[in-house]
Amino acid sequence: MRSRPVALLAATLLVFSVDCAEIDITYNLVPAEAQVPIGYAASIWESILVSDVPIKVLVTWAPLGNATLGVTFPNGRRDFAGAPVPQTWYPTALANALAGTELNTGENDFEFYLNASSDWYYGTDGATPNGQYDLVSVALHEMGHGLGFVGLSKKEGATGSLGLLLQSDFAPLITAFPWPQLDTLPGIFDRFLAHPQNGPLDFMENPGTVLGSAMTSNQLRFNGAFAMDANGGVEPRIYSPSVFALGSSCVHLNESSYPEGNPNELMTPFSSTGSANHWPGPLCLAIMRDIGWTIAPDVGLAEQDQHHRIGVSPNPVIDQLNLLVPFPRMRKATIIDAMGRTVETTGIINSIDLCLLPPGSYSLRVEGTGQIVRFMKQ
């Protein structure tokens, strides 16, 4: 690497004892221009999660009507060797990561549909025009479901259930993998859902009317320890409106609690045109950790104090990364890529020329601050 005015130092190798995830995508009828932002979204998840087993994904481009941007179907396994919780369904991407081996040979780990009729923005810069939906954001959201931000809730009449979903509930959409017999067992995500008065959903009669009432109470919480820690000690709100919506209820963060502009907005049920979010957010990452995922060591879960946060712009960056380091003393900054290589600079930091770095996900650390900022290089 040639010398620069900001004194970039030679790259060295950092050794981590973990392997970030690899997401292998098969595209079905997806136009080439749409494959770029979908792959970009996958690279974000790859930089976050740790797994020795490649994650196999099928993406299908098909008309889904006017109200739906995407639909995800995770494959599942339960009671596998090393399963942390028995009698519980795990998405196979997570089950494979926990088992350290592929449990579903010849099958996809999850499949998702994207609406071919929607007006999509195919860029990866987050500059989504009014009237268009950001495909990176939606693909990132759907992959979040496939990786485990998903449950097995259903309500018919007054009766709610966990683990009674049928493939016919989602007709005419189908999956290439065999639909498992769920046997009235909850998913690992469901194990953390609770009503403030009636307790955890998996303690309720299943199927049952008390369970059904909780599912439409607008009061559901996620009671995982990491999620609570990332939410200031409070259980995050889960979307549970008074009218049950299959595929939306009980499998998203609450829309009104985490509206557009909130760092946790990605995994809420609704998306707006003209907006973009290319990061899962601290609550989603904490929930992933609660259900069993190992998060890469350079990924921070909690939000930093807004008045003392390190800032970077633009993000994604093409060549020049501008830094805001709101600390009076000079510090060392380290940029680490997904391969473990680091570029160091010292002194007062204003900007770094990254034009020679390959595209991908990176993390910026500033010595002595305890902060990590993620950014994408195009």
What are these regions (language model features)?
Residues 1-22:
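Bacterial Sec-dependent N-terminal signal peptides
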Residues 3, 359-378:
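C-terminal tail/sorting-segment detector
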Residues 20-140, 146-297:
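Extracellular zinc-dependent metalloprotease catalytic-domain scaffold
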Residues 53-55, 329-333:
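Short beta-strand/loop motifs in extracellular/secreted proteins, especially
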Residues 295-313, 319, 326, 342:
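Residue-level detector of functionally pivotal "anchor" positions at catalytic/ligand-binding pockets or at interdomain
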Residues 326-331, 369:
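Short proline/glycine-enriched turn/loop motifs at strand-loop junctions of beta-rich domains
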Residues 335-343, 362:
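Short, glycine-anchored, charge-dense loop/turn motifs used at functional sites
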Residues 342-358, 371-372:
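Glycine-centered tight-turn motifs at strand-turn-strand junctions
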